[in-house]
Amino acid sequence: MVNISSPLRFKWVAVILCTCSISSAGPVQIPNLQVPASAAVHQQAVKDIFLQSYSAYSEFAFGHDSLLPVSRSFVDDRNGWGATIVDAMGTMLLMDFTDLFNQALDFVTKIDFRQSNTPSSVSLFETTIRYVGGMISAYELSGKQHQILVDQAKQLVDKMVFAWAKPNQTIPFGEIFFANNSPIAAVNNVAEAGTLDVEWSRVTLYTGNQLYTKLSEGSVRTIAKLPSPFPGLPPQLVDPTDNMFVDAFLTWGGGTDSYLEYLIKYARITNTDDNLFADTWHAAVDSSIVELLRTSTIGGHTYLADWNAGEILLEGSHLACFHGGNWIFGGKLLNNQTIVDIGLKLVEACWNTYASTETGIGPEAFSFIAPNGNFSQPDAQQLAFNREHGFWITTSDYIQRPEVLESNFYAWRATGDTKYLDRAASAITSFQKFLIAKETNGFAGLNDVNNFTAGLEDDTESFWFAEVLKYLYLTFDDPENISLDNFVFNTEGQVFEAPPAKAVYGSSTPTAAAGQFQSKTSDGLALPEISPDPLVSIKPGPLDGQ
C-alpha cells in the first residue's frame, strides 16, 4: 500500500489561481466572428477528402468497422457493427451529404446491437463514444426525425448496464461479453470509467430512463470523491470492486484524458446545479498549473508533464493535446482568463510538433527538456532534433488522431486569430500529400511523421471521419454553425445540442476530495489487456539546457 499525503501548499496556491468571487460565464466564441472568403476553398478540400476516404471505405470495407487502405481489405475491431458508418453520420449531415447519410441510416436500422458480430468483448468506452454518441448526434443533427437512432442507442446502453456487476457497484468494469451479459473482472482506467455520462445522459433525455444517467454520472462522482495525489487529478487505474486506485500515475494523456475533459463538458451540457463537476475540473487545472506545467529549455514551449509517484516525467502525446482546447473551453465558461491563456500556450506547443516534422504532421508521443523533471534518454539524432525544435519524437507514427486540430479549432473560435486557419490549411495540404494510399485512393496513417519513406500504416480509423475531418471542416465553416456556445462535442467529435448557458459554472473554489490518497497493487484483478501506463523507460536526465 502506497500512501501519499496531498500537499498542503496547494490550498494556498489555489486561492491565487482562482478568482476570489463568482464570475459570470463568458461566451466561448468571440462575438461576430467571420471566416475570410478564402475559407471556402479549404472547406471544399476537406469535403473532397471525406468523399475520397469514404468512397474507398465503401468499395473495400462497407459494413465493416474500418478500412485497411493499403491491403485493400477491412478489419472488425469494434464488434463488427460498422463503426465507420455510425461514426461518420454526423459529419455527413454537417457536410450536406444527404445520400450518404440516408444510406448510413438504412444500414444502422438493421444492426442488431444485442450481440457482437465478433467473438470480442464490448468496450463500454469505445462503444459509447463511437456508436451511442454517433447515433444520438445524428438524431439531433437530422432534426430529431429518426427515432430509430435513439432506439438503437438505447438497445446498446441496455446491454452495457451489466458492466455494473453488483447492486452496490458504482464504477463499471470496462469490458463485457454481450452473449451472456458478463463483464470481464479487471481493473478499469478513469478515462473509460468516467467518459460515459455525456452520451448516456442524452439517452436518458430522449427515453426518460434515469438509470443511464444514474450509473454513468455515479461513476464520475465516485472517482471525483476519491482522495488523489493532487486535488482533482486522479491516478489512471481504479479497481471497480473496491473503488481504490491501483497506481499513482497522473496524466492528461490516454487513460485519464477524457475523464478530465468531460468534467467541464458535463457541467455545460446538463447545466447541473451540482458544482462537483465544474469545481473538480477547476481543481484539476489548478493542480496541473502548480505541479505539471513545464516550459522547455529550448523554444520556451509550454507543456503538461506526467507525474508518477512523486516523479515528474517530461513527456507528451498527441492524445494529450486535447488539453489546450479543453482549457480554452472551460476557462471561458469559468470566465478565468489565466486558464484560457495557458490553454492557448498549450495549443502552441502541440502545434509545434506538427510544424517541426518533414510531413507537417505531429507524432504519437514526444519528450522534452525542462527544469525539475526526468525524461527518456535521447540518442544523438533525437538530441539534435531537440536543439532545433524544443522536443524530440519518441513514438513516430500518426494514426489519424484529431487532438491537435481539435484544439486548433477551439483556439480559432475563441480568438479569431487567422493563424489557426493557416495551420488548418497546412494540415489539409499535408494530408493530401502524404496520407493517400495508392492501392485504394483512401487515406492512411504514417509510420514515421519525420520520414515519409517509412511508409503508410494500413488503417483508416473511424475517428478520421468523426473528428479529424469534422474539426477541419468546422474550422472553415461559418462560426455560427455549430457554435461552441450552443453545442458540446463528445470525445469522439460527436456534436450535441446544449441548452442556453447558465450565468455561472462552479463555485469559483476548486474542489478537493477529503482524506489521504491511497493506492494499492493490482494483485486482486488483472490489469487491462493493453495497459495505458507508460511503457517508456524513464531515467533522470543530465542534459538540462542542451
Question: Which sequence ranges carry the predicted segments?
Answer:
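A positional/structural detector of protein chain ends, strongest at the extreme C-terminus
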Residues: M1-I4, D544-Q546
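Glycan-recognition and catalytic cores of secretory/periplasmic carbohydrate-active enzymes
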Residues: G26-Q546
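Bacterial N-terminal signal peptides that target proteins for export
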Residues: V2-W12
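N-terminal signal peptide
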Residues: V2-N3, I16-V35
